[in-house]
Amino acid sequence: VCETFEVPYIHIGTDEVAFTNPEFVPEMVAYVRSKGKKVISWNPGWRYQPGEIDMTQLWSFRGKAQPGIPAVDSRFHYLNHFDTFGDIVALYNSRIYNQESGSEDIAGVILAVWNDRLVPDEKELISENHFYPNMLAMAERAWRGGGFQYFDGHGVILPEEDTPEFKAFADFEERMLWLKKHIFQGYPFAYVRQTNVKWKITEAFPNGGDLTRSFPPEQEWADVYYYEGRPYQVKEARGAGIYLRHVWGTLVPAFYPQPKENHTAYAYTWVYSPKTQEVGMWIEFQNYGRSEMDLPPLAGKWDYKGSRIWLNEQEVLPPQWTANHREKSNEIALGNENCVVRRPVLVVLQKGWNKVFMKLPVGRFSTDEVRLVKWMFTAVFVTPDGGEAVEGLIYSPDKIR
């Protein structure tokens, strides 16, 4: 390896293993150094003292930088788990290792694309992991420093419009979309504007494990609902993709501070169109991780949670899934489960206001079919080819133009 790769560093691992020989890791570090290379190792992993290793890579939330040992932060940076619209918010707004700038102890950052599951080609690898948008977000943060808190601070939800965090992300989004149009034309770049997309989302109603149970929002929209003697509030959210509960649970804050299993939420908005037009729609209720063996949805269903969506009172049905296997295997590639690798669902927007309504149940947060359930939704109108957002639309749950 040292002879083949003309690089200054060699990574020797040391994570997720039970150490039985206390001399093995120091011996391997010395051996690699004898070949003229510097050595990187995982943290958590082997416990080093300054001088015993040249750099550590922090791979989980338990990873901690040590004074005297340069560290690279890759905690929460696993693109193979990222969705299209939520995780990039946390990625851009977060400080690297929660520090304003680099130092002798904080060397930089790494984004990981760890597809344990078979990938058919490079284009799908880049598309499903939203590679270019996330790289641009991380590159700006790495070069310029700064940011706001960390992944476990504000999380994956866009903050209020008048906050510095929102203004910074909206500015970045504007510049990123310019790069998409002028620099990345022809490349798989799965992102459209989302800072203009507004929703109202209810508090979650307890469904007792019945994912089909109906609740008051299915009868009428209101600012507060009453069910079984208690009020259920409604709160506004922004974004084309909203995590109600993140894939890593409460480690990364999402819409609900303390989400619970066996609950049902509702999200809705009005969308103003200046004309009647056929458009595409990205719709997704379980963004499939690229390192999981999760099973594809059953025919005619969006997911295993019972998620449903209506446009102007007409239910929007899922596409025909290209994967229908019932055997879990990392050697079976994903089909068209994720919205960015399939043609958008074609729908018609009427001139004027259009009603979008979603029912979002959840049962267990880990099931036989899906190990890491993402309680979430993605819904945004795009051109029929999925290349751009539809121009001239206004997303407003209060019908404000």
Model-predicted regions and their roles:
Residues 275-301:
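A short beta-strand element within beta-rich, extracytoplasmic domains
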Residues 17-21, 46-50, 63-65, 79-82, ...:
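Flexible loop/turn segments at secondary-structure boundaries
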Residues 1-55, 61-64:
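Active-site neighborhood of glycoside hydrolase catalytic domains
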Residues 259-273, 341-343:
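Short beta-strands within extracellular/lumenal beta-sheet-rich domains
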Residues 113, 273, 285-287, 360-362:
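Short beta-strand segments enriched in hydrophobic/aromatic residues
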Residues 60-196:
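Flexible, acidic glycine-rich loops studded with aromatic residues
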Residues 170-260, 290, 321, 355, ...:
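Accessory carbohydrate-binding/adhesion or oligomerization-edge regions at the termini
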Residues 294-296, 300-377:
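Beta-strand-rich ligand-recognition modules
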